[in-house]
């Protein structure tokens, strides 16, 4: 019912919004003359006026939208020599309203972001502009930073190489440019820090996400994980890999849709015998017995590595390491590793060094990270196909922004061939036709392997070309700069689909940067620049007459958005262009997800070799296959989100508790200890207290108190207590007195030492147990779907079990903290002249992880080496 209502009413609501938007644009345009008449000092001083009005509460951001946008437009004209078009103003309004602005390639999304970023920066609460890679973050912050700086708005940029000091300074700027990965990992790292002073982020006010579909949808299935090595025998991966290589096709079944692999009955018996013969499991035992269950894990991952993950498609081997390739962008994902032992299995398969498995220390998802922002917006060229998901997951509506100039690109029907070989022959012939008429061609492939196959075929035909894939990513900017030159042929994976504009005739700025490297003579530089600009203009005319940039797709992607992104490289800003896809029945999408009816019909037609079919019915069938995959992937993302929402609620509780502990100014630990003691005493009484007057009961109580607190009780005095309440009061007093005595001993040496040590104990204990808890939740999540066999809802079961595990973890946390604090001892060294205090071994972990030049977490303001860093552990 809801989906029907959306289809009926959504167009109406869009038109209504459009009408109000055009009125706002008209108001902004009405101020253009007034702003143009202002002096630079008066124009750039508007920021101070706006901020004063906001601080006085006389206006809201919505009230300032029209004058603020007018100021940005005029400032941009003066500083950047770029004036916002009316359609760009509409995009800025959509962003400010917390919507997704769908804008075609080349429509100036980078400039659009300045409107909403400036307006929201006036509150001084922080605006985050999120991009997909470091290059774009640096480029946009430097480029648009000139505009912001002129308006008195501070701008920061964070990349993977930024230091903690630089990160903190950047987060404190009015506007921050960074990548989704850096923001997400900073959030996790902040919640692993040992002092608030070392945290870098300051809140989640407003974010503009560029390429929003890539970040919030494509990457949402991949969690952000900070991990540490775990002790496990990695050599088994190599031993099992050698055995799996001997398996034949009848020994296993694979499901390419879900990327899972299973041993058949015969295959399991074969693997069992191989494991026994290689002394990896005991003779006479079963592969499926409890003691060998871990071996099933190794075998399963080795099978997946060999049969479902392929070099130059899913990953590449670079400098002796297995590096994952992003399926959506075609870029290398340095630092990312497959989880659950799959990466180790791939390393064994490729014969490179097998690294240890990792344990999750902290994790989150982009879905839950970006939902922390009070207001969220985004930009992309392709969002409408995922509008339902944006609305359902992020409460983001999509506004389609019209192009400034009508799109001139011609999208031809797909050609479908029987075999891959015939398809590539047709692709090469089509490229040669374009090349002859000087029409530049961008050929999109889905993998490195396919891009290099095409490159080989073109070389055999004597066609000069460039290849852009994860192997040659360093040359990306230069290759793209030349991709629009007359007759240029560029073969690319999905890397060419994001954040880059292919200008007809070539990009003179980028070409000049490469040609002028090393030339210092200003006169010579000016002469070369003019020559490059004139050549680019001449080349553009040639390309325009040839029909503009031609896009050739060699395979349909699982997502229609990726295909649309490839097409969107052509026809920018009203330029002419052409796009065409060449497909075969052997392509992955048609083979795995296409209907048998389509394949059967094409085969019955008796197509001759080299003959292609073009029909709208076939195009619709392919679109149905893509929709089927998109719906399946959406279901996977929804399921992952529902489970992660459960974990996220616990994550928020633990992180909030952690931040409270770190807050020395407002969080008093004394009541906290007292409450912990009460909880522990209550638990001891519940478990050990049986009957009054029994010496056995008193001895059991005493033994438990000794285990936790390290002190022995007077059995006689304890036995003499007559009521349960008296026992509780007695034990409470003993516990409180012990901790008070410990605290007094520390404070006597240094008034801040006990507080520092106690908070350190709390944090390290919480972090340790949270890590174990995440591992337990991962294990629970892996098998929870089996509960559906018993007619139980896996999600509800997960919620119940996860809550039980959290209660268990907190109970262990309370006991661990009290036990550690109760056993801390201070020992003064025999040589007091060096001013050091020695703590016993039980507390040596308290001071790990703090650099000597960091501020001391005790809050003194001194460097750690001059404060508690003098404590010798």
Swiss-Prot record:
Membrane-spanning intervals of the chain: none
Entry EC number(s): 7.4.2.8
Residue sites binding ATP per the record: 88, 106-110, 501
Cofactor note: May bind 1 zinc ion per subunit.
Entry binding sites for Zn(2+): 856, 858, 867-868
Keywords: ATP-binding, Cell inner membrane, Cell membrane, Cytoplasm, Membrane, Metal-binding, Nucleotide-binding, Protein transport, Translocase, Translocation, Transport, Zinc
Domain of life of the native organism: Bacteria
EC class of the enzyme, as a word: translocase
Xref: SUPFAM superfamilies: Helical scaffold and wing domains of SecA, P-loop containing nucleoside triphosphate hydrolases, Pre-protein crosslinking domain of SecA
UniProt membrane topology term: Peripheral membrane protein
Catalysed reactions, semicolon-separated: ATP + H2O + cellular proteinSide 1 = ADP + phosphate + cellular proteinSide 2
GO CC, any one term: cell envelope Sec protein transport complex
InterPro entries reported for this sequence: Helicase_ATP-bd, Helicase_C-like, P-loop_NTPase, SEC_C_motif, SecA, SecA_CS, SecA_DEAD, SecA_motor_DEAD
MF-aspect GO terms: ATP binding; metal ion binding; protein-exporting ATPase activity
Entry annotated with the keyword Translocase: yes
Subcellular location, principal: membrane
GO BP terms, alphabetized: intracellular protein transmembrane transport; protein import; protein targeting; protein transport by the Sec complex
Cofactors (names): Zn(2+)
Keyword Amino-acid biosynthesis among record annotations: no
Compartments, as annotated in UniProt: Cell inner membrane; Cytoplasm
Annotated function: Part of the Sec protein translocase complex. Interacts with the SecYEG preprotein conducting channel. Has a central role in coupling the hydrolysis of ATP to the transfer of proteins into and across the cell membrane, serving both as a receptor for the preprotein-SecB complex and as an ATP-driven molecular motor driving the stepwise translocation of polypeptide chains across the membrane.
HAMAP family per UniProt: SecA (MF_01382)
Record family assignment: Belongs to the SecA family.
Subunit annotation: Monomer and homodimer. Part of the essential Sec protein translocation apparatus which comprises SecA, SecYEG and auxiliary proteins SecDF-YajC and YidC.
Protein name as annotated: Protein translocase subunit SecA
Organism encoding this protein: Anaplasma phagocytophilum (strain HZ)
Gene that encodes the chain: secA
